[in-house]
């Protein structure tokens, strides 16, 4: 990819807003080094200028004739092209107070830099050929990953594995297209061309590889996005107590008054490396209260959309008609029964409750005493992964799971190849077949950014935070 060094210099705070030990101001562009030199006073005797990629200690001043010191900093200059963006880059490590960072950034901007747009540093890295588009997207996904396994998934794409695989598929189709063009343009010459059987084999083999990538998207979804787990059950079964126990803090109001939870509460946690969105819902019961009726209706809707339902049952009372109705309406493997309040149940009550489940998966806990939480977490993880036919975390990283945009493009490419295979069988002329091959190659190029339209690039990079 050709170089597209920016003609201007951009700057932004590269660390999260708020108080912290260290905050970083990042600059990229042709004036980065000059701006740093204008604002920096070294504390090292005999300082003669910035050595590339070496941290230097000193003071940043405000750029006025008075040279008022703004902060005590560590600064580094990284010359192009071996930088993240492919341009001259400067990073100023300040103390992490918002007022300090704002003052230093203001001084930088007054020296001629402009504020960076969302994702502009990574966009410049892409435009300057430092990474392909799949790697650029992986940067944002690593930052947004809800758990460690999601980071691993994004890291595999940041390493360029997916982009290289897509390019290999596209290059194979390009080779086939070239051979078709030769056959069309020089029909009377004795040139080596693909036999129809070889042509079909190349198309089908590439289509199979694309199908696998598409399947990997859904099978890696729980690692990338996390799972939605809904807590449902009768009023006073202990759903809110269970939510609090899983979170390790009091989030939901717990009382003996039926119908305390009318709306739903949502919190995120990590269970055995799996990011989970826990949703506590209104208790299932018949009620004349209009607000509570809406809460019960919403509970059923949320349960139907969940990756897993934790059906919380008072182990002293067992399952009633509402619980039985919910279990009957749900798909097999989508409900884990949580037998709660085991600290207050007799052995006979607990045995009777287990028998009523007719072999359905269940875990016995006491939310009030915090007992059984580890077993519950393990069961949730196992059932979510089994139900979604999820790749293992290792396989999700090594098998190159694409994101949604990439998967949609892969589906379009696959449609072209499947139509092409049908054309081959029906004897469509090679020149028409070449049009479909060209279309499939073009779509694959969009994935890596070789031919991606500007509106798609804008959508991708606008989703980044400023400073990245």
UniProtKB/Swiss-Prot annotation:
For (6S)-5-formyl-5,6,7,8-tetrahydrofolate, which residues are the binding ones? 26, 91, 130, 468
User: Origin, by domain of life?
Assistant: Bacteria
Instruction: Kindly report the protein's main subcellular placement as a broad class.
Output: cytoplasm
Q: Which GO terms describe its molecular function?
A: GTP binding; GTPase activity; metal ion binding
- Binding residues for K(+): 236, 255, 257, 260
Instruction: Supply the EC number(s).
Output: 3.6.-.-
CDD domains in UniProt: trmE (cd04164), TrmE_N (cd14858)
One Pfam family in the UniProt entry: TrmE_N
Q: Which Gene3D superfamilies match?
A: P-loop containing nucleotide triphosphate hydrolases (3.40.50.300), Probable tRNA modification gtpase trme, domain 1 (3.30.1360.120), tRNA modification GTPase MnmE domain 2 (1.20.120.430)
The alphabetical list of record keywords is: Cytoplasm, GTP-binding, Hydrolase, Magnesium, Metal-binding, Nucleotide-binding, Potassium, tRNA processing
Domain TrmE-type G: start-end pairs: 226-385
Q: GO terms for CC?
A: cytosol
Cellular location(s): Cytoplasm
Which of this chain's residues are annotated to bind Mg(2+)?
240, 261
Q: Does the keyword Nucleus apply?
A: no
Binding positions for GTP?
236-241, 255-261, 280-283, 366-368
GO aspect biological process, one term: tRNA methylation
Q: Which cofactor is essential here?
A: K(+)
Q: Which residues form the signal peptide?
A: none
Outline the subunit composition: Homodimer. Heterotetramer of two MnmE and two MnmG subunits.
The record's similarity note reads: Belongs to the TRAFAC class TrmE-Era-EngA-EngB-Septin-like GTPase superfamily. TrmE GTPase family.
Its job: Exhibits a very high intrinsic GTPase hydrolysis rate. Involved in the addition of a carboxymethylaminomethyl (cmnm) group at the wobble position (U34) of certain tRNAs, forming tRNA-cmnm(5)s(2)U34.
Q: What is this protein called?
A: tRNA modification GTPase MnmE
């Amino acid at each position: 990819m050709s170089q597209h060094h920016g003609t201007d210099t951009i700057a932004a705070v590269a660390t999260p807003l708020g108080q912290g030990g260290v905050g970083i101001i990042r600059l990229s562009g042709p004036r980065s080094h000059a701006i740093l030199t204008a604002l920096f006073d070294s504390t090292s005797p005999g300082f003669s200028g910035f050595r590339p990629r070496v941290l230097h200690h000193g003071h940043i001043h405000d750029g006025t004739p008075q040279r008022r010191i703004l902060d005590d900093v560590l600064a580094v200059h990284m010359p192009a092209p071996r930088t993240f963006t492919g341009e001259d880059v400067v990073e100023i490590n300040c103390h992490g107070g918002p007022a300090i960072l704002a003052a230093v950034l203001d001084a930088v901007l007054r020296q001629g830099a402009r504020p960076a747009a969302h994702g502009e540093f990574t966009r410049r890295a892409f435009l300057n050929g430092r990474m392909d588009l799949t790697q650029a997207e992986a940067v944002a996904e690593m930052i947004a990953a809800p758990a460690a396994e999601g980071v691993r998934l994004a890291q595999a794409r940041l390493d360029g594995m997916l982009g290289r695989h897509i390019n290999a598929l596209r290059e194979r189709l390009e080779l086939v297209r070239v051979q078709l063009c030769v056959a069309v343009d020089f029909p009377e010459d004795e040139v080596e061309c693909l036999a129809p059987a070889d042509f079909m084999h190349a198309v089908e083999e590439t289509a199979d590889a694309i199908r696998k990538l598409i399947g990997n998207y859904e099978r890696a979804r729980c690692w990338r996005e996390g799972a939605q787990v809904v807590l449902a059950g009768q009023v006073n079964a202990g759903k809110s107590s269970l939510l609090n126990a899983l979170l390790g803090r009091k989030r939901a109001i717990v009382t003996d008054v039926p119908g305390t939870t009318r709306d739903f509460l949502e919190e995120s946690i990590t269970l055995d490396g799996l990011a989970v969105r826990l949703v506590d819902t209104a208790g299932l019961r018949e009620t004349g209260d209009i607000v509570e009726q809406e809460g019960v209706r919403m509970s059923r809707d949320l349960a139907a959309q969940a990756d897993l339902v934790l059906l919380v049952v008072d182990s002293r009372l067992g399952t009633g008609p509402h619980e039985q109705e919910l279990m009957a309406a749900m798909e097999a493997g989508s409900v884990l029964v949580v037998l709660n309040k085991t600290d207050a149940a007799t052995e006979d009550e607990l045995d009777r409750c287990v028998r009523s489940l007719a072999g359905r998966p269940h875990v016995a806990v006491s939310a009030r005493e915090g007992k059984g939480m580890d077993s519950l977490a393990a069961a949730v993880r196992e059932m979510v992964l089994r139900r979604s036919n999820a790749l293992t975390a290792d396989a999700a990283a090594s098998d190159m799971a694409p994101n949604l945009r990439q998967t949609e493009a892969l589906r379009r490419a696959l449609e072209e190849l499947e139509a092409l295979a049908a054309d081959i069988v029906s004897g469509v002329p090679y020149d028409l077949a070449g049009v479909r091959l060209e279309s499939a190659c073009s779509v694959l190029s969009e994935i890596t950014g070789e031919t991606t339209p500007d509106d798609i690039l804008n959508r991708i990079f606008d989703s980044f935070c400023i400073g990245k």
